[in-house]
């Protein structure tokens, strides 16, 4: 159970990091 929660948290952090990186890349490309 704890492993499942830690895995879900890791997946959520990875998704947020990828989303921020993608938005930042698009913003830099637009300028």
Swiss-Prot record:
The chain crosses the membrane at residues 3-23. InterPro entries: Cyt_b6/f_cplx_su6. It is found in: Plastid, Chloroplast thylakoid membrane. One of its GO terms (biological process) is photosynthesis. GO terms for molecular function: electron transporter, transferring electrons within cytochrome b6/f complex of photosystem II activity. Keywords: Chloroplast, Electron transport, Membrane, Photosynthesis, Plastid, Thylakoid, Transmembrane, Transmembrane helix, Transport. Its main location: plastid. It is a single-pass membrane protein. GO terms for cellular component: chloroplast thylakoid membrane; cytochrome b6f complex. It comes from the Eukaryota. The keyword Magnesium does not apply. The 4 large subunits of the cytochrome b6-f complex are cytochrome b6, subunit IV (17 kDa polypeptide, PetD), cytochrome f and the Rieske protein, while the 4 small subunits are PetG, PetL, PetM and PetN. The complex functions as a dimer. Component of the cytochrome b6-f complex, which mediates electron transfer between photosystem II (PSII) and photosystem I (PSI), cyclic electron flow around PSI, and state transitions. PetL is important for photoautotrophic growth as well as for electron transfer efficiency and stability of the cytochrome b6-f complex. HAMAP family: Cytb6_f_PetL. Belongs to the PetL family. This is Cytochrome b6-f complex subunit 6. It comes from Welwitschia mirabilis (Tree tumbo). The lineage of its organism: Eukaryota, Viridiplantae, Streptophyta, Embryophyta, Tracheophyta.
């Amino acid at each position: 159970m704890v492993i499942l929660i830690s895995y879900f948290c890791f997946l959520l952090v990875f998704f947020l990091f990828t989303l921020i990186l993608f938005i930042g890349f698009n913003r830099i490309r637009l300028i």
